[in-house]
């Protein structure tokens, strides 16, 4: 059976100025009368949007597994007001945990999401904490008060060019922050710790990706050390996926703003490609991967077809009713610091093992000795707290030897 790539197939119509609309599934049509005759209402016909172009068929997850995993548990989500964090909160709420603890440093987004959550889930108990994952005492106070059974660690810096400018901040949030939360999960006997990672951790070319790879190494090596002596210890699992549509700072809302302003639309390179997922899709796979975990895995997801960003820009311009290059110009600005033309979900040396969900794979990665690597990581953290950028990046490169900088001032460290 032919596999359909929506962005390519629908582009055929868009390129010929044929307006494409969407309708609900047949089962969602509106009953017209008491005989249950159904009709399609005008209001149910909607213009297509870019998410429709990129979206793949609905992903099925084993909701029974996830329910057994989360029901009546105390669940903590760090970075709970972020794009991924708040969607994880919403999806977790559907499985009726005893308490959902939202840990967040940004007070305004936290306030806003709490208002929405109380309307959407009036029966669910939500607790909230304003705290910085970089502050070990704050993190411990949160664990001491709530003793979470499950932790989803979504708090992170993720902006590639900015982290090239401020590598010490990437280390302190993405590495020290992850270490603080992981260490407290062990101390307070959390059952499962789920770290949200990124495809940029694979063969990293930038500070952000390298910092996430170091965090992956820390939590995995910690688990391997603990599990040797105690098979019932906290289970650590990492989930790794690509770009998320509509997340803060992602390309789609950025292009929308540029198109609304009349252009130009800026693309870094005509050949740059990326994998995309919708936020709900990514979050649902995180939940199922967490439920599947036996401890120590790095899960990667089937991200579907990669999308050429230039094609995405052109289609978004056409969807807005304009002609690319005529009504709205596309300008190629050059790759940004730390950016590469394509992302990888796996290192070429990493093999995969299938799981019960065909969309979720286990990456077989190099294992690190905890005692050795934790010493190196602590030295890296000390450098970030007290030192300067270049020595900090140099230490990351020693921990992650495949980290080779691109379009970056740190390329000189690779010579």
Where are each of the predicted segments found?
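Flexible, Lys/Arg-rich cytosolic regulatory linkers and terminal tails that connect or flank
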Residues: 5-74
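Conserved residues in the N-terminal Rossmann fold of short-chain dehydrogenase/reductase
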Residues: 129-130, 172, 332
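Proline-aspartate-enriched helix->loop->beta-strand connector
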Residues: 1, 97-98, 143, 147-152, ...
């Amino acid at each position: 059976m032919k596999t359909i790539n929506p962005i390519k197939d629908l582009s055929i119509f868009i390129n010929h100025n044929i307006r494409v609309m969407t309708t609900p599934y047949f089962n969602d049509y509106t009953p017209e009368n008491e005989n249950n005759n159904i009709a399609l209402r005008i209001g149910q016909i909607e213009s297509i949007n870019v998410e429709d172009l990129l979206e793949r068929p609905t992903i099925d997850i084993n909701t029974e597994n996830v329910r057994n995993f989360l029901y009546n548990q105390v669940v903590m989500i760090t970075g709970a007001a972020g794009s991924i964090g708040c969607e994880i909160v919403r999806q977790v709420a559907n499985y009726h945990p005893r308490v959902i603890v939202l840990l967040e440093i940004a007070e305004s987004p936290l306030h806003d999401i709490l208002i929405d959550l109380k309307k959407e889930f009036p029966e669910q108990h939500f607790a909230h904490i304003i705290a910085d994952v970089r502050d070990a005492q704050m993190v411990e106070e949160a664990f001491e008060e709530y003793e979470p059974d499950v932790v989803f660690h979504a708090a992170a810096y993720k902006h590639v060019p900015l982290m090239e400018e401020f590598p010490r901040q990437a280390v302190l949030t993405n590495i020290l922050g992850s270490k603080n939360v992981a260490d407290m999960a062990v101390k307070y006997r959390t059952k499962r710790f789920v770290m949200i990672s990124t495809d940029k951790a694979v063969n990293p070319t930038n500070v952000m990706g390298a910092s996430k790879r170091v965090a992956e190494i820390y939590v995995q090596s910690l688990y391997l050390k603990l599990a040797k002596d105690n098979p019932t210890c906290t289970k650590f699992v990492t989930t790794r996926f690509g770009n998320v549509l509509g997340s803060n700072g992602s390309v789609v809302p950025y292009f929308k703003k540029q198109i609304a302003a009349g252009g130009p639309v800026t693309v870094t390179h005509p050949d740059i490609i990326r994998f995309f997922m919708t936020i709900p899709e990514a979050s649902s796979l995180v939940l199922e991967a967490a439920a599947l975990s036996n401890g120590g895995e790095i899960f990667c997801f089937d991200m579907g077809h990669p999308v050429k960003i230039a094609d995405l820009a052109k289609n978004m311009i056409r969807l807005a009713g304009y002609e690319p290059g005529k009504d709205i110009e596309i300008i190629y600005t050059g790759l940004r610091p730390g950016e590469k033309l394509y992302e990888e979900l796996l290192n070429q040396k990493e093999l995969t093992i299938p799981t019960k969900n065909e969309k979720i794979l286990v990456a077989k990665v190099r294992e690190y000795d905890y005692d050795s690597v934790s010493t190196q990581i602590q030295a890296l953290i000390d450098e970030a707290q007290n030192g300067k950028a270049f020595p900090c990046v140099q230490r990351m490169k020693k921990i992650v030897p495949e980290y080779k900088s691109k379009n970056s001032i740190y390329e000189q460290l690779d010579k």
